[in-house]
Each structure stands twice: as structure tokens, then as C-alpha cells.
Amino acid sequence: MSLFDYRVSELHSLLHKKEISVSDLVDESFKRIHEVDEKVQAFLTLNEEQARAKAKELDEKLATEKEFGLLFGMPIGIKDNIVTKGLRTTCASKILYNFDPIYDATVVERLNEADAVTVGKLNMDEFAMGSSTENSGFQLTRNPWDLERVPGGSSGGSAAAVAAGEVPFALGSDTGGSIRQPAAFCGVVGLKPTYGRVSRYGLVAFASSLDQIGPITRTVEDNAYLLQVISGLDPMDSTSANVDVPDYVSALTGDIQGLKIAVPKEYLGEGVSEEVRQSVLDALKVLEGLGATWEEVSLPHSKYALATYYLLASSEASANLARFDGVRYGYRTDHAKNLMEMYKQTRSEGFGNEVKRRIMLGTFALSSGYYDAYYKKAQKVRTLIKQDFENVFEKYDVIIGPTTPTPAFKIGEKTSDPLTMYANDILTIPVNLAGVPGISIPCGFVNGLPVGLQIIGKHFDESTIYRVAHAFEQATDYHKQKPTL
């Protein structure tokens, strides 16, 4: 039995009783990484020497101090678009292959203050643009449940590492589903918090009005502990919200008696596989048995979400990625004769095809003559999508549906058709456009592959999402299933 089969509260208790040490936890993590990561390829960079040194320091602290936080000594993996001082951060892009940050992201600072131990940086789609982690500039991460299938994306490395038992926790980022979709594919728990709940300072920007950092874990309880630590106002991020952070773990009462659930007909309609639809209906029966009620509703503007998202996200990306020019950091071409040629060649050689595709789309949408027809119209539709959610939440506590239309697809199956790949996020994108929180939890299996249940809540009401997710988790055993590697 692995130490990471225990919940974090159980590991904390074992540390408190001196039955295990922090070094034991860190050793367990690296042992597992060395055993299975050659197959899974979740990690881009390991932090082994520094992690072991920190473990020794924390063991000394453990010997003298009686009180310490729940994340004390816990190994964690960080998605490679979150900057870590002195630890290479590449965004899985060749243009940043040698970037060594000089500061920590706010979430990393908060983890360090909580005495968590960073064991390494995790693979992703380049600059978080993708749904399969096939767009990484360095390696192909595989799904631990079936090594011939994708782990999802863009936080595929984070979800795969947790599912494979390499770390008990990981951080990901979610712009259009990039935490929830890989969590669903890998059979783990992934939360996209409300926009503004978690600081984005130190998150390399893709689409600034959509990006949000969040936790990926094996259980809902562990997820709540991690969100507790990373949440809260940050003066370094002007979009960080000055909203009190509740005690998320206290919300895990298991009581959902009288809870009102909305199920959008658009989320169980065309494009969603029959097996996934049935898994969601079965999950709703479980929640009914626990005292909740559900009704079908409509989110009428959901059909425009995909087009709206790709116009807005690509427009923001075209501006955000202009900073990668070969002058200040990262890759610089050797084949340029003058400054302008250096800019062009550096970006052409450094960025992958999907990143270049989205930069071009965004530049087009923002260009003179097209701004009103595309970007401005997309912003108006985004407002309508947000209003759809607000209307439903006037009557219901949460919205529930599948996280993805299908389970994990095969590697290479969708790479030649970008539109088919984009459609994989059709159920997660509206949540980002509305800025509300959403979680994916395991709710079944189809042919041995995990299926994710998405629970969506009101602005800054992650507590209710956690309460529902935890109640379902306690009534089922899907979260206890593990892949065989």
C-alpha cells in the first residue's frame, strides 16, 4: 500500500504521531516517479535534490514543533506554466526551454509557507493551448488508465501524476476546462475556482480574463485542503478578489438534503456519448437518494460558447504572447540578419503549430475592420452566457452534467482536426466564460476508462460544490479505483 493511498488528514496524523517522516513522503514520491514516469511522462523537470534537502529541514522542525499545517511535508507537483524560483519553467514550449524564473508565483509562495514540498514541474499543452497534452514541445504524457490514450489537457501532466500515484497533489490551470477535463479523463478530482478566488500572479498568461489556478487531487477532502491554502486576496494581482475564504473542509458534512440541482438539457444532448449520459443519470440517482432533487433546465446560449471562447481566448493570447520575442529571455534564433528578422524567426521556430494558429486567429479577430464583427460580438455573447447561469442560480443551488462528452480518446485520434479537438471542451468552456466555479469528480467507468461528473456553483460558492461532491464521493467508490501501471 502506497502512502499516497491515505488522505492528507491521515498522513498529517501519521506525521504528528511520528510514525512517518517528511523524508518518507518525499522518498515515496520520487520512488514512484522513477518507477512509472518513463511510461506516463508526466514530469518535465524534477526538483529532487532541493526537495530532499527541504524534507530533512522539515523533519528537524517536526522533531521540535507540536503544531503544523495540514500540507506540512506533503509532496506536490506544479504545472509548468506556474513560475518557480530557481526551478525551470517552460510552459512546455521550446521558446522557454531555458527559462529560470527569479521569483515564485503567489500560489507557490503560499505552498512554501505551508511547508509543502515541490517535487517537480508537470507537462502540459504548450502555453496551456490544447485538450490532450499532445501539444507539448517536449514529450507526450500518457493516460495512466490506458497508455495509448491522452490524459486530457492542458493540465494533462498534473492529472496523470496524481492518477499514477506520483504525488498526492498537483496544481493546474484552467482557461476553458484545462483542470476539469484531464481530471475527468484520469479519474481524479479537479476544481476550477471562481475567477479571482486564487491569485494569477506568476501564472504565465494565456487568456487573462479566463485563466485560473486550481487543485488536482485524489479526493474531494484533499482538494478542499489545497484550495484553502492557495486562495485569498493578493495585492500583486489586480483581478484577485477581496472576498473572505471560508473553511472549505467544514462544508464537507455529507448533508445535501433539500439541495436543488439543475441539469441543462444542452449538457446531455447531441455529441455526448450514451455511456457518459447514463453515468451522469446514475450519479443523479445517487444524489436523489441522499435527499437532493433535480430538474432539467436550459442554458440557451451554450451553443455559442465554443466560438465565443476561441475568439476571446485567442485574442487575449495574441496580446499576451507578444512578449516572447527572443530579447529578454528564452529561445533566440541564430539565423537572423537584423532585429525584425530575429523577432519573426524566433517566434516561428520557438512556438508550436497550435500556438501559432491561435495567435493568428486572435490577431485577425482584433484587426481593424474585424474587431466589431468578431471580438466585440463575442464579448456580448459572453455576457449572455453569464446571464444564463445567473438565471438558473436564482432557483437552483448547483448545476450538474458531464465534464466531457466522451472518455479519453486515443493518442493521435484528433490531432489532424482542430475543430474536433476544440469540441472536447464544449461542456467546460461556459464555466470559464461565466467566471463561476466548477469541479470534476469520478462518477463511473466506460470500458475501463473514467467518466467525470461536473458540478458547477455560484460565484465564490466553492463550499456548496465541495459539499455535493463529497456527499457523492462518500456514497460511491469510484475515487478509490486506481490504474494498474
Swiss-Prot record:
List cellular component terms (GO). Answer: glutamyl-tRNA(Gln) amidotransferase complex
Q: Which GO terms describe its biological process?
A: translation
At the top level of its lineage, which domain of life is listed?
Bacteria
InterPro entries given for it?
Answer: Amidase, Amidase_CS, Amidase_dom, AS_sf, GatA
Q: Name one GO molecular function term.
A: ATP binding
Record key words, sorted = ATP-binding, Ligase, Nucleotide-binding, Protein biosynthesis
Reactions catalysed: L-glutamyl-tRNA(Gln) + L-glutamine + ATP + H2O = L-glutaminyl-tRNA(Gln) + L-glutamate + ADP + phosphate + H(+)
Q: What is its EC number?
A: 6.3.5.7
Give the residues annotated as active site: 79, 154, 178
Record's keyword annotation contains Transit peptide: no
What is its quaternary makeup? Answer: Heterotrimer of A, B and C subunits.
This molecule's function is given as: Allows the formation of correctly charged Gln-tRNA(Gln) through the transamidation of misacylated Glu-tRNA(Gln) in organisms which lack glutaminyl-tRNA synthetase. The reaction takes place in the presence of glutamine and ATP through an activated gamma-phospho-Glu-tRNA(Gln).
- Family of the protein in this entry: Belongs to the amidase family. GatA subfamily.
Q: Which NCBIfam families match?
A: gatA
Check the record and name the HAMAP family matching this protein: GatA (MF_00120)
Which named protein is this?
A: Glutamyl-tRNA(Gln) amidotransferase subunit A
Q: Which organism is it from?
A: Anoxybacillus flavithermus (strain DSM 21510 / WK1)
Chain's gene name? gatA
